[in-house]
Curated annotation (Swiss-Prot):
Belongs to the flagella basal body rod proteins family. Keywords: Bacterial flagellum. The gene is flgE. Coiled coil: none annotated. This is Flagellar hook protein FlgE.
Length: 409
């Protein structure tokens, strides 16, 4: 062994110790991925002959281990963990894009979602979602301030689900054909006009013939006298199997006066089936209007959707976090703070929602711990130290041989 080989051995094993030490030091770092050196032997050829000369060892590259770390529950809304493929995409103040598995995020003073280094978590905000701007080029820092206020919305749609009881045969003998022979109980629902004023609608049914019903809608509002009739001419017809065969989408309009200030409302009849069994009628009502509300809380779903909960008891999707992945993540360039930057060898980023095909799963209120195996790294440290000591001992031996040769007389 030559002095050059021993020096080479000292340098390489010193680098090996540094790599293992870095792994051990980051055993508790959130989202940290361990690295392993890839060694290769150095071979040279003699200038004067074809003799092959072994010249030591080198490190060709660091192999990054992107296996999953263990998820640790924190019960904190802005702690996120990824299982399998995917990175959080973050943006620094200069607009450079980085990638991380550290899902510990915060809200800054401007209500941006940021990591511990102040980098902005990217995704889509409420405006992009409402306008169906789902292109990757529209990813931007997620900002919740834009969703602080949920503007009032006038009712434009009412959904009505009902199962009615066909009892015409039992009453037909004592009533005229065109008389109302069966009345349902009155059901009410609160709707909203464009000025955020609530109004109560009463809805009831009258059976007027076999497989025919009349739908009655009235306003039960103190501000509008005489229980204003909105419509009284909705006739619902069913076939012999109890399926609705008349129009299932109706327009609610005022019939009597101009007191009403509601926007046009569409009444949708969903799954409206008539049953002849002796069951109780079942009616469900819902509508899409509400008064204004302020954001009081939000939660992040497993697909990255951010759901805002407002003081008016409404819930709205106000943003979405998207993940990035790479064909060759081992070639990402490590940066300070458990982040990586893309390289030519890593390939271009591919963006998608958590849980989509090829993308990992997102777990809220969890953090991914370091994937460092301490037992393995401590063994590697012992091996690296032994190798270093062996190279140092070889260096001493070479040094003594050289001194002996120099001192020969």
């Amino acid at each position: 062994m030559s002095i050059i080989e021993t020096i080479n051995g000292l340098m390489i094993n010193n680098d090996y110790i540094d790599i293992v030490s870095n792994n051990i030091a980051n055993a508790s770092t959130i989202g940290f991925k361990s690295s392993t050196p890839s060694f290769f032997d150095i071979v040279s050829h003699s200038f004067y002959s074809n003799q092959i000369i072994k010249s030591g060892v080198g490190i060709s590259n660091l192999v990054q281990n992107f296996s999953d770390g263990v998820l640790v529950q924190t019960n904190r809304d802005l702690d996120l963990g990824i299982v399998q493929d995917g990175f959080f995409r973050v943006l620094d103040s200069k607009g450079y894009v980085y990638y991380t598995r550290n899902g510990h995020f915060l809200l800054d003073k401007n209500k941006n979602i940021v990591n511990g280094q102040g980098m902005y978590l990217t995704g889509q905000n409420q405006f992009d979602l409402k306008n169906n701007l789902n292109s990757i080029s529209n990813l931007e820092p997620i900002n919740l301030r834009k969703s602080d206020l949920l503007s009032a919305k006038a009712t434009s749609q009412i959904k009505l689900k009902a199962d009615l009881i066909n009892d015409f045969s039992s009453t037909n003998s004592i009533t005229g054909k065109n008389d109302d022979i069966s009345n349902s109980e009155i059901h009410d629902i609160t709707i909203y006009d464009k000025n955020e004023n609530p109004h109560k609608l009463n809805i009831s049914f009258n059976q007027i013939d076999d497989h025919q019903w009349k739908l009655n809608i009235q306003l039960n509002d103190e501000k509008i006298p005489d229980n204003e009739i909105i419509n009284d001419n909705f006739i619902l017809k069913f076939d012999s199997e109890g399926n609705l065969i008349s129009n299932s989408s109706l327009q609610i309009k005022s019939k009597n006066s101009k007191n009403i200030i509601l926007d046009p409302i569409t009444l949708n009849l969903e799954c409206f089936l008539e049953k002849s069994e002796t069951n109780m009628p079942s009616i469900e009502l819902s509508q899409n209007g509400y008064t204004k509300g302020f954001l009081k809380h939000f939660e992040i779903l497993n697909n990255g959707e951010i759901i805002g909960q407002y003081t008016n008891e409404e819930e709205q999707k106000i943003g979405q976090i998207f993940l990035a992945k790479f064909i060759n993540p081992e070639k990402l360039k490590p940066e300070s703070g458990s982040i990586w930057s893309a390289t030519h060898e890593s390939g271009q980023e591919k963006i998608g929602a958590a849980g989509d095909q090829g993308f990992g799963s997102l777990y809220t209120k969890f953090l991914e711990s370091s994937n460092v195996d301490l037992n393995k790294e401590l063994i590697n440290m012992i091996i690296a130290q032994r190798n270093y000591q062996s190279s140092a001992q070889a260096f001493k031996t070479e040094d003594r041989i050289i001194n002996t040769l120099v001192n020969l007389k």
